[in-house]
Amino acid sequence: MGQAAKVLQLFKTLHRTRQQVFKNDARALEAARKKINEEFKCNKTETSPKKIEELIKIGSDVELILRTSVIQGIHTDHNTLKLVPRKDLLIENVPYCDAPTQKQ
C-alpha cells in the first residue's frame, strides 16, 4: 500500500475512533476533530518517506491509546461520575493471589 493510501486510511481510522470514544460528547468530538485535522494539515507538505512513516506510526499509536485507554465519565450528581466503558475496554479479570502458598 502506498504512503498516500496509508495516510488516508489513518485519517479515516482516527475519525472513526474519535466518534466511538467520544460518543454523545459534542465538545470532545469537536475538539478531537479539530486536533486531527490540524495535525494532518500541519504535515500536509511533508515529503520525506522516513518522516511520513514516523508520523504514521505516531498516529497509529494515538489511535490505539484512544481506543484502549480512554473511558467516558458522565456527571450525575455533584462530585459523582458515571463511567461508561466500551467493549474494547472490558478485559477478562484474572484472579490474583498474592499470598504465598505453604510448602508441605
From Swiss-Prot:
According to its UniProt entry, one GO biological process term is:
mitochondrial respiratory chain complex III assembly
Share what the entry says about its subunit structure, partners included. Answer: Interacts with UQCRFS1.
Tell me the first and last residues of the signal peptide: none
Membrane-spanning intervals of the chain = none
Task: Please provide an example of a Pfam family that matches this protein in its UniProt record.
Answer: Complex1_LYR
Named from the GO MF annotations, one term is: protein folding chaperone
- The main location class comes to mitochondrion
The answer to whether keyword Chaperone applies is yes
The cellular location(s) given in this protein's UniProt record come to: Mitochondrion matrix
Q: Which residues carry this modification: Phosphoserine?
A: S60
Question: What keywords tag this UniProt record?
Answer: Chaperone, Mitochondrion, Phosphoprotein
- What InterPro entries does the record tag this protein with? Complex1_LYR_dom (IPR008011), Complex1_LYR_LYRM7 (IPR045298), MZM1/LYRM7 (IPR050435)
What role is this protein assigned? Assembly factor required for Rieske Fe-S protein UQCRFS1 incorporation into the cytochrome b-c1 (CIII) complex. Functions as a chaperone, binding to this subunit within the mitochondrial matrix and stabilizing it prior to its translocation and insertion into the late CIII dimeric intermediate within the mitochondrial inner membrane.
Q: Supply the name of the protein.
A: Complex III assembly factor LYRM7
Similarity comment text for this entry: Belongs to the complex I LYR family.
| GO CC terms of this entry | mitochondrial matrix
